[in-house]
Amino acid sequence: MEASEPVAETISKRFWTLIKMLRFYVVLRRFGYIDPLIYSIDPKQIKDVLSEALREFVSYTSSSSSRSIVIYDDPKNPVTAQAPCLVVAKRDEIPQNFPSIYRYTIYKIDKSSEYCISPLVVNDKYATLITPNESVIKEFFDKLDSNIQYARVLASLAVGGE
């Protein structure tokens, strides 16, 4: 396990946008993009899977709608912010514990029983959609060519929550 700790640290710091994008699919329970990262031994297959996940993610972003979400960073003083919602889900469509486990991906929509599912960075009253850029993707693919563990650790961090 010690050997993978530096990989996990590197991925958390350098590739956090990829983690957040994949976490979006975890919340949707779309593991077709997660499982190959864990089980594949072929970097090309992993790159193909990630490329497809990115294409679909771009499709989600292009059809997102803006909603007023509630941010509970300080439970005593919740804040509302406008945010792009990639998916709007009803309460019964989300497992009960997911909003607390994936609290930076699932947000309660203000004055509604629905949830906004989007990987966001929230600063004060501003919410920004997280999207991996081309240089991050290229760098990850380069790392993947030299160490297949990058894919497995990326998947583990995406499933892990927050």
Curated annotation (Swiss-Prot):
Q: Keywords on this record?
A: Antiviral defense
InterPro entries listed in its UniProt record: Csa5_I-A (IPR048642)
Output the Pfam families linked to this UniProt entry.
Csa5_I-A (PF21681)
Q: What GO terms in the biological process aspect are recorded for it?
A: defense response to virus
Superkingdom of source: Archaea
The listed outcome for residue 35 to A is: Altered protein oligomerization, protein has a smaller radius of gyration, elution from a sizing column is altered
Subunit note: Oligomerizes as an infinite helical thread in crystal structure; disrupting a potential salt bridge between Asp-35 and Arg-55 leads to altered elution from a sizing column. By immunoprecipitation Csa5 interacts weakly with a Cas5/Cas7 complex. There are 3 csa5, 3 cas5 and 2 cas7 genes in this organism; the immunoprecipitation studies may not distinguish between them.
Function, as annotated, reads:
CRISPR (clustered regularly interspaced short palindromic repeat) is an adaptive immune system that provides protection against mobile genetic elements (viruses, transposable elements and conjugative plasmids). CRISPR clusters contain spacers, sequences complementary to antecedent mobile elements, and target invading nucleic acids. CRISPR clusters are transcribed and processed into CRISPR RNA (crRNA).
Name this polypeptide is given: CRISPR type I-A cluster 1/Apern-associated protein Csa5-1
Taxonomic source organism: Saccharolobus solfataricus (strain ATCC 35092 / DSM 1617 / JCM 11322 / P2) (Sulfolobus solfataricus)
